[in-house]
Amino acid sequence: MDLTFPKHLYYEPEHHVWCLVESDQKIRLGIDPLGISSLGELAYLSLNPLESKVRKGQAMGVLEAAKMTGELIAPLSGSIIKRNREALEDPYQVNQDPYGKGWLCVIECEDWETESCLLYTSPSPR
């Protein structure tokens, strides 16, 4: 897998989630290649329902992969306004194209200005 990290994205390195600012407070989320590499091939992916509130650091979904099963942790607080149906139906897309067809959801962030300060513009750990 190609471990590239586009510079126009923000990263939450602890849980390997990338964030793309789409407009205003709308943020597209996905799993970064390092996270995918450590998970192995995804077999199952579930996200909280549309319009559900998520809190930074809390579960926004569940995933099952070759190397682990666990919760998908939200990097930001807000509401899920869009879910990637194709990735939910075929989680392998997340492995194959994490920045393209494998994105997870779009969150309407409650306070991007404050919460984005805790994200990185490269995946380097603290």
Residue map of PLM features:
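A residue-level detector for short acidic-glycine micro-motifs
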Residues: W18-L20, K82, D111
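Short histidine-centered loop motifs in beta-beta connectors
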Residues: S38-K53, I73, R83-N84
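A structural signal for short beta-strand/turn segments enriched in small hydrophobics and glycine
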Residues: E51-A66
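Conserved small/polar residues in nucleotide/adenosyl-binding loops
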Residues: Y120-R126
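Interdomain regulatory linker/hinge segments that flank or connect interaction modules
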Residues: M1-H15
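Short beta-strand-turn/beta-hairpin segments enriched in glycine/proline and small hydrophobics
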Residues: V21-E41, A65-K67, E71-A74
